Regions:
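Catalytic machinery of carbohydrate-active enzymes
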Residues: 1-357
Length: 357
């Protein structure tokens, strides 16, 4: 049951990573801010994720730098030294690292995910749980943290600052092209990467529709190599910005794009925060749980067919169930994705503009 909190109750968020998840959490945190504008909010977050969200207004961020090992915990405790316990701690991550952090933080109420959703000793850290519900998408489950603090039902919305410098840099990277498809081909798990030949063919198809194609990626060598391979395979020129952007510049690229295409990755969820159409490529996880929020109608979903072919229909409703196998992405056909692109381009719908301030 929702419980009212005082008008100045202090709230701590524990969600360290990853990019997609912190994008989901941002919508929840900003809903809490709207309902409880006088409640101070502290968010303990990873170093990389902080570069994307660290300028969100009205939130105190404390960086948890996992590269420091135990020193990361000491750094957090040092910054909180002398403070009263938080009134509420929202334990929104269940990894061992984040659960250990939640355990040592002082708070009167420690609220965790619904029973059955946690792992890594999550239940030993929290003294309350978000009530179970029919919610299946990760963001909808996270909304339970807001509801338990008496926040009424809300549609997910984001207001993430993008500076004029970052917007200008993004425009320069794409040579001031106004209509472009942004390819985000990589994923944290290499099994989720679609065939480079398919990406190149998709890029050529987009060119035939009068679009510029931009390929992005992190500075990791694997991403650099993948982007270069796609560019070499394509018959038409692709603007390659892999390894050349900060997360804020990438966010600006997502905002300015006509459409973003890629597998389950942080970039797709960043694009969702900017209300840019997203074509998600899903074979390993259920897009109705991890897909681009507000954009599930444009998902190339082979997951359901693969699950059915393996007689795993019951597991379809199991939260967190994933398939494994490098061959699974081959089930996503180029024709499916080009058809989805046609649908996006024929639609005038782009969700209402979002604030960059």
């Amino acid at each position: 049951m929702p419980q009212s909190i005082g008008p100045r109750s202090s709230i701590c968020i524990v969600r360290l990573s990853a990019i997609g998840d912190v994008c989901h959490v941002t919508a929840v945190v900003q809903a809490i801010q709207r309902q409880h504008p006088q409640s101070p909010i502290t968010w303990i977050i990873g170093r990389l994720e902080h570069t994307l969200l660290g300028d969100l207004p009205g939130i105190e961020f404390i960086i948890f730098d996992k590269s420091k090992g135990l020193g990361a915990y000491r750094d957090v405790l040092r910054q909180l030294k002398g403070r009263a316990p938080f009134d509420v701690l929202l334990q929104m991550q269940t990894s061992f690292r984040s659960n250990l952090l939640g355990k040592i933080l002082r708070a009167k109420r420690k609220i965790g995910l619904p029973n059955g959703y946690g792992k890594e000793l999550h239940n030993l850290v929290v003294n309350e749980h978000v009530p179970g519900s029919e919610a299946f998408h990760v963001l909808d489950v996270y909304k339970g943290f807001a509801h338990i603090l008496d926040v009424p039902p809300f549609d997910a919305a984001w207001s993430i600052p993008i500076s004029e410098n970052d917007q200008r840099r993004a425009r320069e990277l794409v040579n001031h092209n106004q209509t472009y498809l942004l390819l985000a081909p990589s994923a944290s798990n290499s099994e989720r990467i679609w065939n480079p030949e398919n990406y190149a063919a998709l890029a050529d198809y987009a060119h035939s529709k009068g679009m510029t194609v931009v390929v992005t990626g992190s500075p990791a060598q694997r991403d650099i190599d993948l982007a270069r391979q796609i560019c070499e395979l394509a018959d038409n020129a692709i603007v390659n910005v892999a390894g050349k952007t900060s997360l804020k510049e990438l966010l600006a690229l997502c905002r300015q794009a006509r459409v973003v295409v890629g597998p389950d990755s942080g970039t797709l969820h960043m694009a969702t925060t900017q209300q840019t159409p997203v074509i998600g490529l899903y074979a390993h996880s259920n897009p109705f749980r991890t897909g681009p929020y507000h954009g599930l109608s444009y998902v190339a979903n082979s997951y359901a067919d693969i699950m059915a072919s393996r007689g795993l229909q019951k597991q379809m409703k199991q939260w967190g169930y994933r398939l494994k196998g490098a061959e699974l992405m081959r089930e996503i056909k180029l024709e499916t994705v080009t058809s989805l692109l046609d649908r996006v381009l024929s639609s005038t719908e782009k969700r209402p503009s979002v604030s960059m301030n």
